[in-house]
Amino acid sequence: MALRLEDKQAIVAEVNEAAKGALSAVVADSRGVTVGAMTGLRKAARENGVFVRVVRNTLARRAVQGTAFECLAETFTGPTLIAFSNEHPGAAARLLKDFAKGQAKFEVKGAAFEGMFIPAADIDRLAKLPTYEEALAQLMMTMKEASAGKFVRTLAALRDQKQDAA
């Protein structure tokens, strides 16, 4: 189906706007995925703050020009699904990685984070980033363990002093 120039410009503007506000992006090949599965993916994406769009390659290249995701231009071959994480850098990577487990034909092509290209083989690096809440919890656990360890060392030093004095 041929798109009019105005429609193409609207798509480029929409994807460019999503790219400018995004923390990371993931590109995938959705060839062979059923409509029902894609609908489920889009629903999960909305729930996780991820913008998902199937875009023509030339329009995708134009949309990411001048953004941190320009490094993805080489992955725009064949059917292209692009997902932008808006709330958490690893959200799109995690979502598409989990979706690919249930879809044999779904293939992640690559990702970008802070202007750096991440190959599909290394997508786990981005998917395993902790959320803000998880990072805070890890920080609190580290601080708690450090203070408990310091307390134990203080008690051990006090015990050693008393043993030396006796």
Curated annotation (Swiss-Prot):
GO terms for molecular function: large ribosomal subunit rRNA binding; structural constituent of ribosome. GO terms for biological process: translation. InterPro entries: Ribosomal_uL10, Ribosomal_uL10-like_sf, Ribosomal_uL10_bac, Ribosomal_uL10_bac_type, Ribosomal_uL10_CS_bac. It comes from the Bacteria. Keywords: Ribonucleoprotein, Ribosomal protein, RNA-binding, rRNA-binding. CDD domains: Ribosomal_L10 (cd05797). Transmembrane segments: none annotated. The keyword Amino-acid biosynthesis does not apply. One of its GO terms (cellular component) is large ribosomal subunit. PANTHER family: 39S RIBOSOMAL PROTEIN L10, MITOCHONDRIAL. Belongs to the universal ribosomal protein uL10 family. Forms part of the ribosomal stalk, playing a central role in the interaction of the ribosome with GTP-bound translation factors. Part of the ribosomal stalk of the 50S ribosomal subunit. The N-terminus interacts with L11 and the large rRNA to form the base of the stalk. The C-terminus forms an elongated spine to which L12 dimers bind in a sequential fashion forming a multimeric L10(L12)X complex. This is Large ribosomal subunit protein uL10. It comes from Shewanella frigidimarina (strain NCIMB 400).
